[in-house]
Regions:
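Catalytic-core regions of hydrolytic enzymes
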Residues: 32-162, 177-189, 244
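Bacterial N-terminal signal peptides
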Residues: 15-27
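Short, flexible loop/turn motifs enriched in small residues
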Residues: 31-34, 216-218
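Generic amphipathic alpha-helical segments used as scaffolds and interaction surfaces in large
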Residues: 2-3, 178
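Von Willebrand factor
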Residues: 3-6, 27, 32
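Bacterial N-terminal signal peptides that target proteins for export
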Residues: 3-17
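Active-site-adjacent mobile loop/cap segments within catalytic or ligand-binding domains
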Residues: 168-251
Length: 251
């Protein structure tokens, strides 16, 4: 990884926008070698609605927030390249999302999702990095988010026999050592702190086996911005003010 990117991520202060300010400290010649690129991944889309409830669909909320995050980064740092895995209501496979970020040589990947729980009382934000699922509720998140691969006609070939609904698949999953783990953890912690500053309840940073993170060759996180199963949070996420607040916390 170029020194410019390592320097930027290591000295992140309060948010991603603050992180990007660090680019100004790097010599222009070094910056020119590789443009700092942020890929923003709006979860689900098209035939994959994601979680649904309280009058909202995950795919619509994630797209709206993703666009706001990108706009805020561009406004504050026009020198940064901002790309989206999807900018409309279309279906994009999990592997295709990671492949896009890798092909674009992204410096960071931010995957935005909406949570759900059987209990309507569960609420809050949480941000995931690639790691071993230590608790049953963590594994349920991985199964839910990875299940989108089943909507792809050739998923058995694309994902090499990985079954997102099978506990055994996760047990046998070859994690290897994630070279970007520490940077991803640092970024996830910063985002959760920003959520708290915005008045949102933080459920903390968690590790899980999420396909889009496992296939991304850069620091990457998946953030769950709230529970659509909770009426109050659903109302907040569906409102323009709520989406602006959440986007500011991520950006």
């Amino acid at each position: 990884m170029p020194l410019a990117e390592i320097h930027a991520i290591r000295y992140i202060r309060a948010s991603i926008l603050t992180l990007l300010l660090c680019l100004a400290l790097v010599p222009l010649g070094m910056q020119a070698q590789r443009l700092f690129t942020v890929v923003i991944d709006a979860g689900h889309g098209g035939k994959d609605s994601g979680t649904v409830g309280n009058g909202g669909k995950e795919k619509d909320i994630t797209l709206a927030v993703a666009k706001l995050v990108g706009s805020k980064i561009r406004a504050a740092h026009p020198e940064v390249r901002v790309l989206y895995t999807r900018s409309t209501d279309v279906f994009v496979g999990l592997q295709a999302r990671a492949d896009f970020a890798n092909k674009q040589k992204a410096s960071l990947m931010l995957s935005i999702h909406v949570n759900s729980a059987p209990s309507k009382d569960v609420h809050g934000t949480e941000t995931y990095v690639l790691g071993i699922a230590k608790f049953a509720n963590n594994l349920s998140v991985a199964m839910r988010e990875n299940k989108a691969m089943l909507l792809e006609s050739n998923y058995k070939t694309t994902y090499k026999g990985f079954d997102p609904t099978s506990t055994e698949s996760y047990i046998m999953f070859d994690l290897m050592q994630d070279a970007y783990f520490n940077k991803s953890i640092e970024l996830a912690n910063k985002i959760q702190r920003q959520y708290r500053s915005a008045g949102r309840y933080s459920r903390g940073v968690r590790q899980d086996i999420l396909w889009v993170l496992s296939q991304s060759a850069m620091p990457s996180i998946l953030t769950e911005i709230g529970f659509l199963s909770n009426a109050n949070e659903a109302s907040f996420m569906l409102s323009e003010a709520g989406q602006q607040s959440l986007a500011s916390a991520i950006a």
